[in-house]
């Protein structure tokens, strides 16, 4: 068979066709392939947008308007790209949540590359948000890059180096466009490494136990199952793009960037609001930045905080309760991130931030130990 002998086809065959897969993985395992779909979608639409976009402060805003008004189906490509980012992060957060729930983080290499992918995706999305050069683009870039000035000693110099001047200006926009274009390809390369390490161990499953004795080939079982997920997610996506394209955006970004006029509420896109809320909950600049970075980096500690003798949460009611508390807490933080900095939102944000770290670092490891005791293992 050619797919088993041809050097290139052999790699594809081992990854997507004859790959031994657990027979019982649920719909939560669909999000890996959906993330691949999102990445392809973003690179394709982004490429066509880059053909018409100009990364100059004087013309960037107008070039985006030109894409929407004058380019054939430019409005569709632009809104697919903008909402594609939201879809990407929805799939990303569900994918990470699945990994936490079923103990997939015990595949350390795969998990750590996943965290690196999350950081790179967040950086790419942030820089992409700056490109239309609207009010929120400009002020978002100013606020977020300014956070680096909290780094002791080198901070202020580092910020000016990133800006390419003394404020967010033409140099900043040009380099953000260059980086926004190149990063997705670096992400694609890392995705292949992510898959390489995953296929070394094989997939986890909802029971969290080895499934070597009953594995099935990926094709046709999971190609079909993934395709169903693709159809469902595309229906949701296209409904949003065609009926509610601006629902997730900020109206301020329809005003061209003006360094002399600050918007009343500077807020990032919805998918960063939870981290923004954690950042704002600490009334000290360096402390806030450390909390912000820790909120993502804490994921890297999960393999070392795993105390239970079972891998998955499927049969651990205490840890399940804590997991869903964590999900609720993140939704609460997302809401707080979009609210102004005034009572009662300040204290709610601070309590939710404390709760976030407490659940992950303290309560879940303790719950694992209690469950071990309950089972008398």
UniProtKB/Swiss-Prot annotation:
GO BP annotations listed: mitochondrial electron transport, ubiquinol to cytochrome c
Compartments where found: Mitochondrion inner membrane
Cysteine pairs bridged by disulfides in the record: none
Residues at which heme b b562 binds: 81, 180
Gene: MT-CYB
Descriptive protein name: Cytochrome b
ATP-binding found in the keyword field: no
GO molecular function: metal ion binding; ubiquinol-cytochrome-c reductase activity
Membrane topology according to the record: Multi-pass membrane protein
Cofactors required: heme b
Cofactor note: Binds 2 heme b groups non-covalently.
Function: Component of the ubiquinol-cytochrome c reductase complex (complex III or cytochrome b-c1 complex) that is part of the mitochondrial respiratory chain. The b-c1 complex mediates electron transfer from ubiquinol to cytochrome c. Contributes to the generation of a proton gradient across the mitochondrial membrane that is then used for ATP synthesis.
Family: Belongs to the cytochrome b family.
Organism: Heterogeomys heterodus (Variable pocket gopher)
């Amino acid at each position: 068979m050619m797919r088993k002998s041809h050097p290139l086809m052999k790699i594809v065959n081992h990854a997507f066709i004859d790959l031994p897969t657990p027979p019982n993985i649920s719909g939560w395992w669909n999000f890996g392939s959906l993330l691949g779909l999102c990445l392809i979608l973003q690179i394709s639409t982004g490429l066509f947008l880059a053909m018409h976009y100009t990364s100059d402060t004087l013309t960037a805003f107008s070039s985006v308007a030109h894409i929407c008004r004058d380019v054939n189906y430019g409005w569709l490509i632009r809104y697919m790209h903008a909402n594609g980012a939201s879809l990407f992060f929805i799939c990303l957060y569900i994918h990470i949540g699945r990994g936490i729930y079923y103990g997939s983080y015990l595949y350390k290499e795969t998990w750590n590359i996943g965290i690196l992918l999350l950081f790179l995706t967040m950086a790419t999305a942030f820089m992409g948000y700056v490109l239309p050069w609207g009010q929120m683009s400009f002020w978002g870039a100013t606020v977020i890059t300014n956070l680096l000035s909290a780094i002791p000693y080198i901070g202020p110099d580092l910020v000016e180096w990133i800006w390419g001047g003394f404020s967010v200006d033409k140099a900043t926009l040009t380099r953000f466009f260059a980086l926004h274009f190149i990063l997705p390809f670096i992400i694609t390369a890392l995705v292949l490494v992510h898959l390489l390490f995953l296929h070394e161990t094989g997939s986890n499953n909802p029971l969290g136990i080895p499934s070597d004795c009953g594995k099935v080939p990926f094709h046709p079982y999971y190609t079909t199952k993934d395709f169903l997920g693709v159809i469902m997610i595309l229906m949701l996506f296209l409904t949003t793009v065609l009926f509610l394209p601006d629902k997730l955006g900020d109206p301020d970004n329809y005003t061209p960037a003006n360094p002399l006029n600050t918007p009343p509420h500077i807020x990032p896109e919805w998918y960063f609001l939870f981290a923004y809320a954690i950042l704002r909950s600490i009334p000290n600049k360096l402390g806030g930045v450390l909390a912000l970075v820790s909120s993502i980096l804490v994921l890297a500690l999960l393999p070392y905080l795993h105390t239970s003798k079972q891998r998955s949460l499927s049969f651990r009611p205490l840890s399940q309760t804590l997991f869903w508390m964590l999900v609720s807490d993140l939704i609460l933080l997302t809401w707080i991130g979009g609210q102004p900095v005034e009572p009662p939102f300040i204290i709610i944000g601070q309590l939710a931030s404390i709760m976030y770290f407490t659940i992950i670092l303290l309560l879940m490891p303790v719950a694992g130990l209690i469950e071990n005791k309950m089972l008398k293992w």
